From Swiss-Prot:
The keyword DNA damage does not apply. Residues 1-10 have a biased composition (Basic residues). The keyword Secreted does not apply. Residues 25-35, 143-152 have a biased composition (Polar residues). Residues 19-64 are annotated as: Phospholipase A2-like. It comes from Murine minute virus (strain MVM prototype) (MVM). This is Capsid protein VP1. The N-terminus of VP1 is sequestered within the mature capsid. It contains a phospholipase A2-like region and putative nuclear localization signals. Residues 132-142 have a biased composition (Low complexity).
Length: 729
C-alpha cells in the first residue's frame, strides 16, 4: 500500500462550492447545496482514512461509492462532474482494503435492514458477558480509586451496540424486557429536542419524533376512481362556493406524513425557538420504521357468544415504498389535518393515500333569487390527453417487512430559504427620515409642530406645490393590496384565489388580510373533552404589522390630484363598483409590482405544514401560502405503507372481491428533523414581547390549554410565531 497521505490545509474548489474539490479544509462552514454536503462528508471520511494510516487517493473506497450514490440525481454541474469522476475512479483504481469503513452522516439508500446470521448472536452474547464482567470490574476499580475513566463515552456506546446485537431471536431490544418475543426488537422511542450551539450565533436544532402507528388492511385491494358531485348543494342558486365536484384515485396505500410542526416539537420548544431566535431553516430529514407487529383477527362462536381471537402472524407482510424521485402526485396531509398525531404517548394512524384525477367541471355563476334554473351543473368524462393514473406498484421499489423487521429512508438534505421569526412594524409611512420639527413641546402632554406644508423640502410624485406625510415618496411598497374574495374558474371548477397572509388591521377584515382558518380534530390539537362531529376551529392571524391591509380606509384619486376631491374624482371603500352594493375597489385593486416588499408567511405551530414541493413550472411563485419552506429541488419522498394481501384458501381470481383474513398491524415510526437557527441579538432598551403562558383560564395563552385534565383530556391551539419586532429599514 502507498504511504499515508497528508491533508492540505487549503485546496481548490470551483466557484459556488466550499468542499467540492481536492485538498480543501474541513471547516469552511455550511455546504452550499446537497452536492457540496456530500463532498463535505466525503472529505471527512478521507480524513479518517488518512488518520488511520491509509491513502484513499490512490484506491477506490466506500466513501467514494457513497459520494456516487449521493450525487446520482445531482442537478448542479459540480455534482455531476464529481459523480462521473468517481465513477471513472471506480473503473480503474484498486479497491481500498480495510476492515472497517469510517462512519459518516451521509445519505444511505432507503431499504430494509437485514438481520445478521444466528451464529453472530451467539458469539456476541459471549462477548457481551465478558464485556459486562470486565466493565463491572473496571467500574469498581474506578469508583474506589476516585480516578476518571478515559473514553468512557466510547466504552458505553460500544457496550450498547454489543447488547443490541446480542439480543437476537427471543431476546429483548435495546435493554428492554426479557425474552420471548419474535425477531429482533430494534430502535428506541425518542421525542427529545437537542440544541447545539455552533458559534457566531448559530444553533443546530435536532428534533426527534417517534409514534406508534396503527394500520388496518385497506377497504379494497383495488385502485378506485371515485366521483364526487354534490348536486344537492350546487343546484341551489348562488351556492357555487359549496361546490365539491371532483374525481379522485383512491389507492390501497396509506401515507405516513410527518410534515407538521406538532409532530416534531413540543409547545415549550416552539416557545423557546420563537423567543430567542431570529431566523430558521431546514437542514435534513431521516425516517425509519421498526418493531413491526402483524396480527390476524378471527371470530369463534363459544356457547352462542362471538369471541375475537388475536394472533401474531409471522408470515404476513407490510409493504413500504418511498417516492424519493417525486414521481407520484404530491399530497401533503397537513392541509386536511391527517398527519401523524401531535401527542407522542398516543397511538396514531396513517392517512389513506389518494390523489386528484382530471375531469372537466361546468358550473354556472348564479345569485340568490335569480330567475330560472341553474343551467350548467355537470361534470365531464376522462380525457385521453390529460388522464394520469399512477400506481405505486409500477413506479416504486417496494420493501416487504414482516414481524420484527425495520426500514430506513436514508438522509434527505433540504435546499430551502430561511424564514424570519421576528415581525416587522414599519409601514410605508414609517420608512426613512421623519419630517423636521419646527417647535418642540414644552410639556409632556404637548405635541410638536412641523414646518408649513408649502415650505417643506422633499420629494413627491404628485403635481402639487406642498409636501405632506401622506404624499412623500418612499423607497418601496411595504405589503400590497390584492383582490380578495376572488373566485376564479378553471376547467375543474371555481376556486378561491390564495392571498398572502398579513396582519389584521381591522378586526372585521380577516378575509381581506388572508387569515387562515384551521379546522382540526383531537389528534391535532382539538380539546379531547369536546363532543359532536364539528371539529375545533381557529383563525390564524399573521403577525406582520408592516404589511397589514386596512381596506376600510384606503382610497384612489383621479389625476391630477385635487384636495379635497370631488365625488367623481375619488373611489373609496364605501363606493360600490357599478351599481353593486358592498363590492368595492379593494376586491379588484392590486398594488403588487417590482417595488413591492412583503413578509414571508410564518410557520404555524402545531397545525401548520413545514415544507412544500416546488411547482414544476418554468416560472415559480415566490412563496407558498401552505408552508414556509419550499424545496428548490425534489421534496422529501412520500412514505407509503400498506398490509400485503392476506388471502384465504377460497381465492378466486375471477371473483369481484377477495376472500381475505382480517389483518392489522402496528409499527413504530421514528424521524429526525435537523434545523439551523440564528440567535436573536438584543438591540432595544425596552423589554420585548415574549411568548409566555398565563394563569388566566379565559386568555389565549392560558397554560391550562396545554395541561391534561383529571381524565387526560388535552388541547393545543396555535402559538404565536413572531413575537419580537425588528427593523426592516
Amino acid at each position: 500500500m502507498a504511504p499515508p497521505a497528508k491533508r492540505a490545509k487549503r485546496g481548490w474548489v470551483p466557484p459556488g462550492y466550499k468542499y467540492l474539490g481536492p485538498g480543501n479544509s474541513l471547516d469552511q462552514g455550511e455546504p452550499t447545496n446537497p452536492s457540496d454536503a456530500a463532498a463535505k462528508e466525503h472529505d471527512e471520511a478521507y480524513d479518517q482514512y488518512i488518520k488511520s494510516g491509509k491513502n484513499p487517493y490512490l484506491y477506490f473506497s466506500a466513501a467514494d461509492q457513497r459520494f456516487i450514490d449521493q450525487t446520482k440525481d445531482a442537478k448542479d454541474w459540480g455534482g455531476k462532474v464529481g459523480h462521473y469522476f468517481f465513477r471513472t475512479k471506480r473503473a480503474f483504481a484498486p479497491k481500498l482494503a480495510t476492515d472497517s469503513e469510517p462512519g459518516t452522516s451521509g445519505v444511505s439508500r432507503a431499504g430494509k435492514r437485514t438481520r445478521p446470521p444466528a451464529y453472530i448472536f451467539i458469539n456476541q452474547a459471549r462477548a457481551k458477558k465478558k464485556l459486562t464482567s470486565s466493565a463491572a470490574q473496571q467500574s469498581s476499580q474506578t469508583m474506589s480509586d476516585g480516578t476518571s475513566q478515559p473514553d468512557s463515552g466510547n466504552a458505553v456506546h460500544s457496550a450498547a451496540r454489543v447488547e443490541r446485537a446480542a439480543d437476537g431471536p427471543g431476546g429483548s431490544g435495546g435493554g428492554g424486557s426479557g425474552g420471548g418475543g419474535v425477531g429482533v426488537s430494534t430502535g428506541s422511542y425518542d421525542n427529545q429536542t437537542h440544541y447545539r450551539f455552533l458559534g457566531d450565533g448559530w444553533v443546530e436544532i435536532t428534533a426527534l419524533a417517534t409514534r406508534l402507528v396503527h394500520l388496518n388492511m385497506p377497504k379494497s385491494e383495488n385502485y378506485c376512481r371515485i366521483r364526487v358531485h354534490n348536486t344537492t348543494d350546487t343546484s341551489v342558486k348562488g351556492n357555487m362556493a359549496k361546490d365539491d365536484a371532483h374525481e379522485q384515485i383512491w389507492t390501497p396505500w396509506s401515507l405516513v406524513d410527518a410534515n407538521a410542526w406538532g409532530v416534531w416539537l413540543q409547545p415549550s420548544d416552539w416557545q423557546y425557538i420563537c423567543n430567542t431566535m431570529s431566523q430558521l431553516n431546514l437542514v435534513s430529514l431521516d425516517q425509519e420504521i421498526f418493531n413491526v407487529v402483524l396480527k390476524t383477527v378471527t371470530e369463534q362462536d363459544l356457547g352462542g357468544q362471538a369471541i375475537k381471537i388475536y394472533n401474531n402472524d409471522l408470515t404476513a407482510c407490510m409493504m413500504v415504498a418511498v417516492d424519493s424521485n417525486n414521481i407520484l402526485p404530491y399530497t401533503p396531509a397537513a392541509n386536511s389535518m391527517e398527519t401523524l398525531g401531535f401527542y407522542p404517548w398516543k397511538p396514531t394512524i396513517a392517512s389513506p393515500y389518494r390523489y386528484y384525477f382530471c375531469v372537466d367541471r361546468d358550473l354556472s355563476v348564479t345569485y340568490e333569487n335569480q330567475e330560472g334554473t341553474v343551467e350548467h351543473n355537470v361534470m365531464g368524462t376522462p380525457k385521453g390527453m390529460n388522464s394520469q393514473f399512477f400506481t405505486i406498484e409500477n413506479t416504486q421499489q417496494i420493501t416487504l417487512l414482516r414481524t420484527g423487521d425495520e426500514f430506513a429512508t436514508g438522509t434527505y438534505y433540504f435546499d430551502t430559504n430561511s424564514v424570519k421569526l421576528t415581525h416587522t412594524w414599519q409601514t410605508n409611512r414609517q420608512l426613512g427620515q421623519p419630517p423636521l420639527l419646527s417647535t418642540f413641546p414644552e410639556a409632556d402632554t404637548d405635541a410638536g409642530t412641523l414646518t408649513a406644508q408649502g415650505s417643506r423640502h422633499g420629494t413627491t410624485q404628485m403635481g402639487v406645490n406642498w409636501v405632506s406625510e401622506a404624499i412623500r415618496t418612499r423607497p418601496a411598497q411595504v405589503g400590497f393590496c390584492q383582490p380578495h374574495n376572488d373566485f376564479e374558474a378553471s376547467r375543474a371548477g371555481p376556486f378561491a384565489a390564495p392571498k398572502v397572509p398579513a396582519d389584521i388591521t381591522q378586526g372585521v377584515d380577516k378575509e381581506a388580510n388572508g387569515s387562515v382558518r384551521y379546522s382540526y380534530g383531537k389528534q391535532h390539537g382539538e380539546n379531547w373533552a369536546s363532543h359532536g362531529p364539528a371539529p375545533e376551529r381557529y383563525t390564524w392571524d399573521e403577525t406582520s404589522f408592516g404589511s397589514g391591509r386596512d381596506t376600510k380606509d384606503g382610497f384612489i384619486q383621479s389625476a391630477p390630484l385635487v384636495v379635497p376631491p370631488p365625488l367623481n374624482g375619488i373611489l373609496t371603500n364605501a363606493n360600490p363598483i357599478g351599481t353593486k352594493n358592498d363590492i368595492h375597489f379593494s376586491n379588484v385593486f392590486n398594488s403588487y409590482g417590482p417595488l413591492t416588499a412583503f413578509s414571508h408567511p410564518s410557520p404555524v405551530y402545531p397545525q401548520g405544514q413545514i415544507w412544500d414541493k416546488e411547482l414544476d413550472l418554468e416560472h415559480k411563485p415566490r412563496l407558498h401560502i401552505t408552508a414556509p419552506f419550499v424545496c428548490k429541488n425534489n421534496a422529501p419522498g412520500q412514505m407509503l405503507v400498506r398490509l400485503g394481501p392476506n388471502l384465504t384458501d377460497q381465492y378466486d381470481p375471477n371473483g369481484a372481491t377477495l376472500s381475505r383474513i382480517v389483518t392489522y398491524g402496528t409499527f413504530f415510526w421514528k424521524g429526525k428533523l435537523t434545523m439551523r437557527a440564528k440567535l436573536r441579538a438584543n438591540t432595544t432598551w425596552n423589554p420585548v414581547y415574549q411568548v409566555s403562558a398565563e394563569d388566566n383560564g379565559n386568555s389565549y395563552m392560558s397554560v391550562t390549554k396545554w395541561l391534561p385534565t383529571a381524565t387526560g383530556n388535552m388541547q393545543s391551539v396555535p402559538l404565536i410565531t413572531r413575537p419580537v419586532a425588528r427593523n426592516t429599514y
